[in-house]
């Protein structure tokens, strides 16, 4: 990830990025199990078009000497409901990472009616918005970053890889942009505003971060994101895309 400053990232920036990736690892491991469950129980392409709405990670205690990364053996518990043209999917799974165990809940959504209007990102509410120039740090997110995350995590949902697919799934994403992974935004949030030890982590994806694939007009080939250094909330422009609880 690039910061708003010219030149290569500083060592502390790289260290923070590694910390954010490590903190979101339980959610990534859980998502892999959910993806495998979907492939087993649904059509092969059922992963494409799913929208990530929320991720909740709760720490649990495990016995000493647990393996470094061990996925829970029970598999995900999946609940599916329909509401107003959307399929809502809630999954819960336990994963073990390092010496800790986490119960991870992912909330996903899929549009089932093409006639529905696109979802709109929730604007920052009066009194809770922050000034991007004074209340947070600026970061650049490129399509290369999104593609690298897809390769590393195995989440190759078409909305993150192919232009127009996010809009078809129900997001207000431009024709030359993709939607960044929710957990990639979560890693960025946790890198900038690390939680206290063993604190539950609640990531709410209330809008899409649109990342351009091709240059549009005079704009650069990156998304400009502002991360609040205190809360970890992320905004693109004045539009909030991630809120931490």
Describe each PLM feature range:
Residues 1-52, 117-123, 127-196:
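Hot-dog-fold acyl-thioester-processing enzymes
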Residues 10, 33-35, 71, 103, ...:
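Residue-identity detector for glutamine
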Residues 51-141, 207-211, 218-245:
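HotDog/MaoC-like acyl-thioester-processing domains
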Residues 166-241:
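Catalytic-pocket segment enriched in acidic/His residues
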């Amino acid at each position: 990830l690039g910061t708003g400053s010219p030149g290569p990232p500083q060592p502390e920036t790289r260290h923070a990025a590694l910390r954010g990736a490590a903190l979101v690892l339980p959610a990534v491991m859980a998502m892999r199990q959910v993806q495998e469950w979907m492939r087993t129980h649904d059509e092969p392409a059922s992963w494409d078009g799913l929208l990530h709405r929320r991720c909740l990670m709760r720490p649990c205690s495990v016995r000493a000497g647990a393996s470094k990364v061990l996925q829970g053996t029970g598999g995900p518990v999946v609940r599916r409901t329909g509401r107003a043209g959307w399929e809502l999917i809630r999954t819960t799974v336990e994963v073990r990472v390092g010496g800790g165990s986490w119960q991870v809940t992912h909330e996903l959504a899929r549009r089932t009616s093409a006639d529905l209007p696109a979802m709109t990102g929730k604007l920052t509410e009066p009194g809770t918005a922050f000034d991007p120039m004074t209340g947070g740090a600026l970061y650049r997110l490129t399509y290369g970053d999104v593609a690298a995350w897809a390769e590393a995590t195995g989440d190759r949902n078409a909305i993150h890889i192919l232009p127009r697919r996010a809009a078809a799934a129900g997001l207000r994403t431009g024709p030359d942009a993709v939607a960044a992974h929710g957990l990639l935004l979560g890693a960025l949030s946790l890198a900038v505003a690390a939680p206290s030890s063993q604190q539950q982590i609640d990531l709410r994806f209330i809008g899409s971060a649109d990342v351009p694939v091709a240059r549009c007009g005079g704009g650069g080939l990156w998304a400009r994101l502002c991360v609040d250094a205190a809360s970890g909330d992320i905004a693109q422009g004045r539009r909030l895309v991630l809120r931490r609880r």
